[in-house]
Amino acid sequence: FPNATITGLDPANDAAELNGLHERIRVITCDSRDASCVAKLGSYDFIVDDGHHSLDAQRSTLKTLWPFVKPGGLYVIEDVADWGELLIADRAYLSKIVGRETPYFFLETLRSQTATSSWPGVPKMGALVFRRV
């Protein structure tokens, strides 16, 4: 994405110190689950959720940020455990947020497969990818 403008959200107060490192990158002190903060930012072609890693936090962040994905845009939840049956059961909940017609898929990451293969009982990790229609 050589022409991208990147906006980062971070709840840490010192995150804004990263501003000015590049002209097309800005960092805003904001919790991605805070709808009043996010509403001031506009809409985006591509959103990556690499924040809180619990299922509840990822659901909450998706619910807050999804309305700001432009039509044709992508929303990626990074570091999602392959919850298997839980993920399938969660489809009804996800559909309430993103709509029934929204395509999404789970993408296992090679790095995670390598890392978790040596840890029995640890689920494989990946990314959950949504495309706004």
Please annotate each region the language model reported.
Residues F1-V133:
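S-adenosylmethionine/decaboxylated-SAM
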